């Protein structure tokens, strides 16, 4: 599950039911079932990284299972050698603080983009050198379908696309932040990598944030 510098991660707490509909389930039995399923699917004895999906209650439904129970289930599986590291997905700062009393947290996966960038966990991740994976970096496509004029103008300045500028802005927020880019088109994936070479000035980043009425 780990090769060529890549680490495969999986996520528990969300699964499809009998009619192929996503539902939340972070119960102890569901977590064990999901981990065992991922082990079989990936053909490995140990998962490098498993995220516990929580849900912040704003954008995504939260499972009623107490966080401590869910984490203890993962810690037990970890002690059995079935997973190496534990991360949190869609978590709040209180979630993180509680989790750290139970087990080390190796990575964070939260929603973060130009439209939604108020997450105090990023500051913690930066200070602790903990990878922070930003999902929905293009605001579920809104920054592509209806790119604000100021974003388009900034993209023109850097001879880039609005998506590339949005990703470059994310990368500049923290050395620990990594945008999660989802695509089925290899060309689109290559286009996104251009964001790595875009060095936006601090002034331009501030202008973009101010124009979009963002909070730092």
Regions found by a protein language model. Give the residues of each.
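Acidic (Asp/Glu)-rich catalytic clusters
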Residues: 1-7, 39-43, 100-101, 123-128
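A short, structured active-site edge motif that brings together acidic residues
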Residues: 4-18, 52
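Non-cysteine beta-strand/loop elements that form the S-adenosyl-L-methionine
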Residues: 9-11, 49-50, 133-137
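Active-site mouth loops of central-metabolism enzymes
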Residues: 18-29, 58-63
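Short, acidic/polar
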Residues: 27-41, 92-96
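Active-site groove signature of glycoside hydrolases
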Residues: 39-60
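Beta/alpha (TIM)-barrel catalytic core signal, keyed to glycine-rich beta->alpha loops juxtaposed to Asp/Glu
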Residues: 55-216
